[in-house]
Amino acid sequence: DVAPSRGLGDVYKRQGYELLDADLENIVIGQIEKIEKHPDADKLIICQVNIGTETVQIVTGAPNVKEGDKVPVVLDGGRVAGGHDGKKTPGGIEIKKGKLRGIDSYGMMCSIEELGSTREMYPEAPEYGIYIFPEDAVVGESAIKALGLDDVVFEYEITSNRVDCYGVLGIAREAAATFNEKFCPPVVECKGNDEKASDYVKVTVEDPKLCPRYCARVVKNVKIGPSPKWMQRCLASNGIRPINNLVDITNYVMEEYGQPMHA
């Protein structure tokens, strides 16, 4: 709430933080109106895609699209998180108009991986190919908002003298100081019982200099299952693949406090 995302990034760079990545940009819902075969490439097709304000031509090799499909379209000058292999690229990938085997292409249709997400979070997404929106998706609207991925993500290169900023709370504390605002850390209430973890497990610290303190808790009667979608999206935004509720909770707290955890 202290500043627009771009302004916050600019201020942080002046404070000495290197901005590596920002949010996805210029990605809308488009509907494929016409598909033709590429005259010079058997595995490519030429799509006429309605993006609400105009119809753009996009050349693709995706095997799963057909006329009438509604798909995420990144336009000329827009950015995606990475490639279809699911690996995020620092700074993202800027998409520019170009030619594919001699045919003009004015954008790109996206897989769920290129949008920085995974099939674990969106099981309806195909294993290979472009993400297809449901029929009620509105052409021309933000594809990122429709998918619930419209949170702004900054990736910073933290210098070795600022380990306090390895977690979200550290960055929030820095933002409060930068903008002369009050820092309001979350109030954590520790709930538990009188049982001792030492009654269940034994922890041996072999080198107190490297590990001056090790904390462990025993949690019983846990049902392993998927974590909530909001938590999965937060983790995926930080480059962490959601596993299950127990593992995801520890990773979420680690990202929040900068404290390594394991379950």
PLM region descriptions:
Residues 6, 45, 179, 183-263:
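Glycine/proline-enriched, intrinsically flexible loops and inter-domain linkers
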Residues 5-6, 10-195:
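Phosphate-backbone binding interfaces of nucleic-acid-interacting proteins
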Residues 1-2:
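Short, well-ordered junction/capping motifs at the entry into regular secondary structure
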